[in-house]
Structures are given as structure tokens and as C-alpha cells.
Amino acid sequence: MNNMKKIIIISIIIIIIIVLLFYINKSLTNSTKQSLNKIHTDNYDRHVYSNGKYAHFSKITRDDSQLYPSLKYCTKYEFELRSGDMLYIPKGWWHWIESIGRTISVNFWWDNGQIRIPNNKLNLIQPKTRGVNCNKSMVFETNYINNNNSLNNITNPIIIRNGYSSLKEKFTDKFLLDKIPKVEVWDGVNNTVENTTLKKFINSKDKHKYIITLDQFSINNHIKNILKNDVIVPTILSYTNCEYNFWFSYNYMDTGLHYDDYDGLLCVIDGIKKIKLYAPCDSPYLHSFPLFPKWSTILPPTNISYNLYKNIEWMTKPSNNSLPSSMLLFKTVHNKYLITIIDKLYNIYGSNNIIYGIKNSDGKLRWEFYFYRTDTVPGQINILDKNNPESWIPKFSKILQLHMNNVSINKPINKNNLLVSCFDYQPELFPKTDIDLYYSIPNNLKNLSELNSSDLYKIIQTTPETEISSNYPLFIAIYNHNTNLHKGNQIIDFKSSVIKNLDEYLFIFNIPQCKNWIGKTLNYYGSNKNIVCSIAVKKDTVGLFWFGLTTQEFIKFLNENQWNSEYVNWLSTNSKLFDHLSHEICIHYDYNGNPKRSAFYGII
């Protein structure tokens, strides 16, 4: 009997232990998941999509095979760099760099270049931990030799000891303080930037804070100009066209696990850096973030007449044969903050609800985003707080939700008034907001003076079966963010009708002297008989719009209006992926017909 009691007691204890272990494990799992989710988010904030050449991040944030079992299948190389050492990192190699204490370094990047290292001076470094070996995944080490006679196309990392030692004595705190009074400090934990002085940064000695000069993050570019005569390009790169990044930290920081699209040479001026490297063939096990935002690859893409608010068709082609117009937007963006803005807008409004416009003036781009909504009577739209730019996105979204009805872009309008609210984004300017009202020209209208305030609220009457595009010609009035209602200054009509009635339209706009060059220019783009055109008149410019161009006509427009040549070449190479789209363009001219700026439009 006593034995039976003992067995029962022991069994109960075992059951209790099992239950406790289950709940403890569940709690730890949930905690780990929450921690990993936060960590993933942190790395995502630093991650750069394929439109940047650097900083493509992994979701892995700890060198822990318990948290990330796939690390067991990778080959890891670990070593230290000290003052004067250099590390050649070929494109595509994953690297994770920790800085210990005060550390100053310079990174050089280049594309399609080579470095000069004598083959017989390379020694193989064995990895500290070994998983599944990749072909040719080796790291070599050599002492620096000033010999440029041997040329090798090297695809493996190389540690070059004592190859950049001449600057350590020069780059003292005093030297930097005299050169660089003000800096922008990157917080690697919160992914924020603080404007401060170099003296405060040095005195604070905060962990995870550092100074960088990466172009794609648009910070500290002044430092590169200040130090351009002090930073020495190593002799092994003396013939390579490269760019550089100055990197300064005063306490512990780590880069996170990432790779770059360019070959790089990390040169340590002062301090210690601990390095982990993984070969490109380990990428399947390293949990990389996607190279394209979700909104840039929406499938199937829709072919839509964006600014005429008419859905033409949903594409049914295989996904590998077509791309949406949002990819045309993505390829113009090289600013992380703007990518974040578009991500937020997409998360709020979803696909096929946001129209974008990209405007080019002397090579400088401005991005505009338009929201098509309906309202019974135009209402007051609150002004954004220009003194608090960090808060404008959520505030603008709230305004839209409170004041406007959301209308799906792929459905006909079934309300009386169409409002188009928009805001601009420029890296150097705060966005502004405007609202456009669309309404038709009365049949007997001969002069703008005949319009009165009541006419402005007689927007086109539509039904679920009737789309705005069947009500040509359309006349547009502007209701701006200062709530001043302006009379109409834009006409939309079929191209053939615009040319036929050009005298009447230009008389309405009071610019009959522009007839010759406007008539010739309208015929320059758009061979399709269903092409729609628009004339928009402002104080000192005339805007001409074409709706429904082919991709080849769109490329012609980009080439002739000084859009970025790299962008045009990319589109020309991949033009078949966009042949299903009907493109919309605009060119603004002065009254003599000289082009001033251009733009194109699409949908997210």
C-alpha cells in the first residue's frame, strides 16, 4: 500500500512538473516571438530595397542557432580588424561588423572593379564554425605589399593587415572637432537621427550611436566634403572609380547582418572591429528581407486610366510577363523616408486606391499622391502642421477618414461630387495639400466669366453605369488648401476633339496666341485614336497632358525630357513587362512653347 501511495505521489509530481514545463516553455516561446518580431522590425527599418546598392538586411539579429536553427547550415568566418587593417568584401557577401570602443573607419565601394593583390601572398583563413561548405567560399589574409603589378579578379574576401595605417595619428578628436562642428548622429536602436555637435557626441559616449555619411540616407553629406582631401584612397584602388563612407563611433555598435550590391573595402583608421562573414551561397539560410516592397509587385496588375478615373481592365497575363505601374514609381525612389511613407499609405488604403505623380524639374523629382474621394459639398480640409513633419502622415490619413468617403478606384463613381486630395513629397520641402474638383463645361459656355459659385458645385451627375470619362469634355476647378475656390483652368477631352475645338478652348483660357505651338505639340505624342488630352493653364505655364500612351511612346517622352538615363535604360530593357499599361504624361511649357518641367502618373 505504501508503495502504491509513493507511486501515486511521484506520478502527481511528474504531471505537475510536465504542466509547469509546458507553460514555462509556452511563455518563453511567446516572449521569444515578441522579441524576434521587434528585432525583425528594427532590422526592417534599416533594410534598403533593391533601388539602393547597400544595406540589404537579414531578419537574423543574434548569432544564436537556437533562435535561428538555419545558421547551423552556414559557414561562418570570424576575425578581428585593428588599426590599419583593411577587409575586401565582394558584392553579395553577408557581413556583420561590431565596433569596440572608439572606432574610426572608411568604407570604399565600387562596381565592376578589381583590386590588385599578388596571388602568392594570400593565406587561407579557416572558419571558426563550419556548416555546409559553399563552393569557393573562402577568406584569405595577407600582409600589405605596395605592389600593383599583379592583377587578379578576386571573388573572395581578403584581410589586408597594416594596409591603412598612415591616418591613425591624424584623425584625433581635436582634428575632427576643428573640422566638423555639427553632425547628425544615427541611433542604431531606435533608427532615428539626432542633430547635435560633434563635441556632445564624443562626450556622451553612447552605445549604438554613430556617424555615417551614406548617400542613400541623406545625412552628414557635408562631412564628406570637409574630409575629401584628408581621406586617402588605398593604392590597390587607385585606378578604380569608387565612393566612400566615413564611419565614426565612440562606443559599442554593430551593423547588423547585411550585404551590399557593390564590392567594398573596409579600412580601419583606429579602433577594433569584430567581423563575421557568410558567403552568398548561404543566403537561403539567412532570412533576408525582400528586395521589393509589396506595393511595387502587386499582381495581377491593372491597366487603368488613372486621372480619368476609369478602369480599363484587370490583367490576366502570367505574373512573370507583366509588372504594375507601381514598379515604375519604385524605381525612381532612392530615399528611405519616402519608401516608408508609401509603405504606410499602402497599409492604410491598400492597392488600386492611390494615384501617384512624379514631377521632374531640372532633374529634381517631386512625388505627389492623390486620393479620389466623393463628398456632397466641398468641405474644409484641416491644414497639416508644417512645424511637426513627423506627424503629418497619420494626421493626413485621419483627415481623409473623417471627411471623405473611400471610393474604390476600380468601380464607377456613384456619388455627385468627385474630390481629388493630394500632397507632395520632396526631400527638401514639406508636403502641401490641394483638392481638385471635376465638373463638366456647360454646352453654351463661351467665357470663364460666365461661371459662378453655384456652377462649381454642379459636378457631373453619374450613376453606377456611367463613368466620368463618358462625359467629355470635362472642366476642372481647383479648391486649394487655403479654402479659396478658383475658377476652372483645365479642359479634358479626346485628342481629336481638343484639336478640333482648340480655338474655342484657348479663347476660354484667354491664350489664343499659343494656338500654333499647342496644336503641333498635341500631335507629337499619342498615335491611338482614343487618346485623351488635357490643357491646363496657370499664371505663367501651359500644361499639356496625354492619357493612354504606349510603353514605347512613354520611353520616347522620358528620353526627350531629360529623365535619368539609368532609369530610361532600365525601362527600355524591361519594356515588354509594361506593354499592357496605358501611360499618362504631362509637360508644362511657358507661353512661348518652351518646356519647363514634365511628369508621369500611375497607380499603387
Swiss-Prot record:
InterPro entries: Cupin_8, JmjC_dom. Residues 1-127 form the JmjC domain. It is a single-pass membrane protein. The chain crosses the membrane at residues 4-24. One of its GO terms (cellular component) is membrane. The keyword Membrane applies. It is found in: Membrane. It comes from the Viruses. Gene3D superfamilies: Cupin (2.60.120.650). This is Putative JmjC domain-containing protein L887. It comes from Acanthamoeba polyphaga mimivirus. The lineage of its organism: Viruses, Varidnaviria, Bamfordvirae, Nucleocytoviricota, Megaviricetes.
